[in-house]
Curated annotation (Swiss-Prot):
Protein name per its UniProtKB record: Glutamate--tRNA ligase 1
Gene Ontology cellular-component annotations: cytosol
PROSITE patterns attached to this UniProt entry: AA_TRNA_LIGASE_I
Database matches in InterPro entries: aa-tRNA-synth_I_cd-bd, aa-tRNA-synth_I_codon-bd_sub2, aa-tRNA-synth_I_CS, aa_tRNA-synth_I_cd-bd_sf, Glu-tRNA-ligase_bac/mito, Glu-tRNA-synth_I_codon-bd_sub1, Glu/Gln-tRNA-synth, Glu/Gln-tRNA-synth_Ib_cat-dom
Motif ('KMSKS' region): 230-234
Record GO terms (molecular function): ATP binding; glutamate-tRNA ligase activity; tRNA binding; zinc ion binding
Name of the top EC class for this enzyme: ligase
Record: residues binding ATP: 233
Function: Catalyzes the attachment of glutamate to tRNA(Glu) in a two-step reaction: glutamate is first activated by ATP to form Glu-AMP and then transferred to the acceptor end of tRNA(Glu).
EC numbers on record: 6.1.1.17
Native source species: Petrotoga mobilis (strain DSM 10674 / SJ95)
Keyword Ligase: yes
Keywords: Aminoacyl-tRNA synthetase, ATP-binding, Cytoplasm, Ligase, Nucleotide-binding, Protein biosynthesis
Main location: cytoplasm
Amino acid sequence: MIRVRFAPSPTGHLHVGGLRTALFNWYFAKKNNGKFILRIEDTDMERSKKEYEDAILEEMKWVGLDYDEGVDKPGEYGPYRQSERLDIYKHYIDQLLNEEKAYFSVTKNDEIIFEGNNLLDKYKKNNDYSVVVKFKVNNDQKISFLDDVRGTIQFDTSNINDFVILRSNGIPVYNFTVVIDDYLMKISHVIRGEDHISNTPKQILIYNALSFELPKFAHLPLILGEDKSPLSKRHGEVSITYFREEGYLPKAILNYLSLLGWNANEQIFDYTEKYQEFDLKKVSRNPSIFDYTKLLWTNEVHLRNDPIEEVHKSFTEWAKYTTVKIDNEDSFVKKIIEASRAKVQTLKQLYEFSKNFFVEEFEYEEEFIEKYMKKPWFKQVIEATIRKLSEIDEYNLANVENTLKEIADLNITSRKNVFQTIRGSLLGRLVTPGLYESIIILGKNESIKRLKRALEFSNTLDINPRR
């Protein structure tokens, strides 16, 4: 059985590098009819926070990477939170001590004063001493493993000193816990970032000392910023929370992240179908550059072309994570999305572009007021529009278009002035979705209501007699 895992530490929000790792693990499990496990590695007690754990779980749910087992999906290999597995780790620490493959190291004022397997009572629970457990490294070993991405990797233990596996606070270190967890959870493939290669020899030493069978390893290439240094906040925002709040589509994010290290043979695709083609052999060894512009373009393409039902779902979910309130009928919102999405790149832009559809009252742009509302012909155009729209019996796009052309043909002012006057009166601004579509979306009664409101507002202005 193929079993892979994504094991974030809850010391911050999920970031693009972590999500790429989770995605490739998800791809591999999905393709091979395996299991994808989410494990929380929270043994860094000072930095780990429950709020970050909750955020990671929520962000995984938001992007759509379902896992089979985890802290909120118990399975037979739990617990799935490392802080709940301390007794398990202690058992294996004791085993290594008993077999003299590890030993106690006692320091006082940073000076080693005792090392051995039989810890004297005077060192126990005495704050004057710092007691850790170290793993004993035999310096004449050659460590070699086959990496599914990079081929054979070799290490010489002469470059590895004895290393701590249990801290003085009684909490085991990462390189120890990850071995115990991966073995007991029957992880078959460890797919993780290239930055973990240096940890692998220490982990293999622990595997061998405990007579555990090794999993297969695959180390993914680093993600770099445009200056070719490891991607970090100094290059720009990297948290999934940020991209969610900015209105990026989950499907677009996963589409783009798929391209960072894997040759997918196309630029735009649905990740829920692409897993069938995933192959670790096609994962590059070379680092990938995170290109914010390309991510935005990818999002734009998905926003324009994905099924309206999916975009609508993403739009309403986006609103829940912001202060935006959208409680309109689904059919109404879908019409707005359809009319707007070709002109924006994100859901946030979509809302800003179309937000006056969602409210009954709004402020008019200053440019609209100065260029149109203050003109002497404004009142004539609006009154004619109210009258003509009221006369339409069958309210459809063709009839609305013909009606507006009839108003323009009255020669009250130029055609552009007529259309922009109506547009601004309906939506308060001069750049909106198509005018005919906007009138249909708002409906006859709401359109007339808004035109009357604009007329009332214009009566409070000083008229500019210049044409």
